[in-house]
């Protein structure tokens, strides 16, 4: 071997050893790994709004949020969804709102720059529905410009062509509480209220409080919305009280012991807002747990405070195990054993929302987070199975039972086209992405190439099998999904 080649090999070996050492140094004593899940600034901005509404802002280090937001403002004056996007309008409006709520003057140079970008992009009237919702909660937008969500939606039977279980898990856990919020249309009184009239490009007195039209078939939803609004104005909303009560019960049933809802901040914030609308007190244990759960998603350092959209210990732990073993670390080494046993403890043996559409499956999956009983997912479960398969644990029989449970659950989650989705079975009614409320186009959870590929990777890597016909169907699905350039679409990121 040439000296130059030997040097390169040594550098690679040293890099692997250093990486292994680093991974081991950040393992939690309980056995798991957990790193920050980065996001744009809307999550933290909305957390500021939540605490202002509940009056709990003085008990959190929210003054550090100002530093966090200022550090991420770009030269063009806006805040971005991804690097170099030129400034996202809705994200920038929410960051501006949060800074104003934190006491920053509208004449502050940072806000003046943000204001210029906001107005250049059309102002508040051009923002997404959820941004308008958050502004409406404190009187900075008119509820007339938001779509109606009749609470009787909660009462639609599971076998009806549309019901809450036709929404993706994240849309469902966020929307059910909003059935209460949109019905009540609250304007909460907060300490040191603000107005954002300066952010209406057309002038606040010239705003048309109407949903935008697309000029296609989806405009039928605008007509329906006009009907819902007329019914509200006449105080004729069928089964209104029953729907609100059903939504309230649904929320309470799905709160984890740790206070979480759905494992994601939007569901947690919306659930807390819904309960605020129903006059729950800040000292109620349900609310205290919910606010504490939001705190648990926060990252505080010396001069900064932000809130993650979600936490990822199960995902991080599975990948850490695989990385260590793949790089030569002994699969029966103590850190691997501890991590593997922690993962087995985290296997979810309760039925969740997935069971509504999947009557055949039995529990045995994993979720992304520490606690999320109702929403395990296929992607995490497949990665955990691969990690456990590689690890050598003292109780191999217990490990085998965990893997078998997961395999059986995953097999029952195969969708009709042949692929796998993340959280649900056959959750694919595309028309839902056309409703005015769903302007983020994320209302459903169809099968995707990346999750399907993960399942096939698991089957091959772990020498596992499913019904041959189902395997062939999944391969056919993947081949059909390949794009003309040769690539596949990655819904769940570059994974």
What are these regions (language model features)?
Residues 1-495:
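Preference for long, amphipathic alpha-helical scaffolds in soluble/luminal domains
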């Amino acid at each position: 071997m040439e000296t130059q080649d030997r040097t390169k090999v040594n550098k690679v070996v040293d890099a692997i050893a250093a990486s292994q050492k680093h991974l081991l140094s950040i393992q939690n004593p309980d056995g798991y790994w957990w790193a920050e899940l980065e996001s744009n600034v809307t999550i933290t901005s909305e957390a500021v709004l939540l605490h202002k509404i509940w009056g709990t802002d003085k008990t959190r280090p929210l003054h550090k949020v100002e530093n966090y937001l200022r550090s991420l403002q770009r030269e063009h004056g806006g805040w971005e969804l991804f690097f170099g996007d030129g400034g996202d309008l809705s994200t920038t409006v929410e960051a501006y709102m949060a800074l104003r709520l934190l006491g920053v003057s509208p004449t502050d140079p940072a806000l003046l720059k943000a204001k210029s970008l906001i107005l250049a992009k059309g102002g508040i009237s051009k923002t997404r529905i959820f941004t308008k919702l958050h502004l409406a909660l404190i009187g900075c937008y008119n509820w007339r410009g938001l779509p109606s969500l009749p609470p009787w939606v909660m009462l639609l039977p599971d076998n009806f062509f549309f019901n809450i279980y036709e929404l993706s898990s994240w849309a469902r856990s966020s929307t059910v509480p909003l059935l209460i919020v949109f019905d009540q249309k609250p304007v909460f009184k907060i300490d040191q209220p603000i107005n954002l009239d300066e952010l209406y490009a057309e002038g606040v007195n010239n705003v048309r409080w109407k949903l935008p039209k697309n000029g296609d078939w989806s405009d039928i939803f605008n007509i329906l919305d006009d009907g819902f609004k007329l019914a509200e104005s006449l105080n004729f909303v069928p089964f209104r009280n029953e729907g609100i009560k059903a939504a309230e019960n649904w929320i309470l049933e799905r709160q984890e012991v740790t206070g979480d809802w759905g494992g994601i901040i939007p569901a947690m914030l919306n659930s807390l807002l819904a309960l605020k609308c129903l006059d729950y007190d800040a000292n109620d244990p349900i609310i205290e747990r919910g606010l504490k759960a939001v705190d648990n998603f926060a990252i505080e350092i010396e001069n900064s405070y932000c809130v993650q959209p979600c936490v990822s210990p199960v995902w991080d732990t599975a990948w850490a195990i695989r990385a260590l073993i793949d790089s030569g670390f002994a699969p029966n080494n103590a850190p691997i054993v501890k991590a593997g046993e922690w993962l087995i403890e985290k296997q979810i043996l309760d039925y969740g929302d997935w069971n509504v559409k999947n009557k055949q499956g039995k529990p045995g999956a994993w979720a992304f987070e520490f606690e999320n009983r109702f929403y395990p997912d296929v992607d995490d479960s497949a990665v955990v199975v691969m990690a456990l398969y590689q690890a050598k644990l003292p109780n191999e029989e217990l490990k085998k039972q965990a893997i078998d449970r997961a395999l059986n659950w995953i097999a029952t989650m195969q969708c009709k086209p042949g692929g796998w989705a993340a959280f649900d079975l056959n959750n694919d009614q595309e028309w839902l992405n056309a409703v005015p409320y769903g302007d983020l186009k994320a209302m459903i959870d169809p099968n995707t190439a990346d999750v399907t590929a993960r399942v096939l990777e698991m089957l091959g890597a772990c020498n596992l099998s499913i019904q041959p016909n189902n395997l062939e169907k999944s391969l056919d699905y993947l081949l059909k999904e390949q794009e003309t350039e040769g690539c596949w679409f990655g819904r769940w990121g570059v994974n």
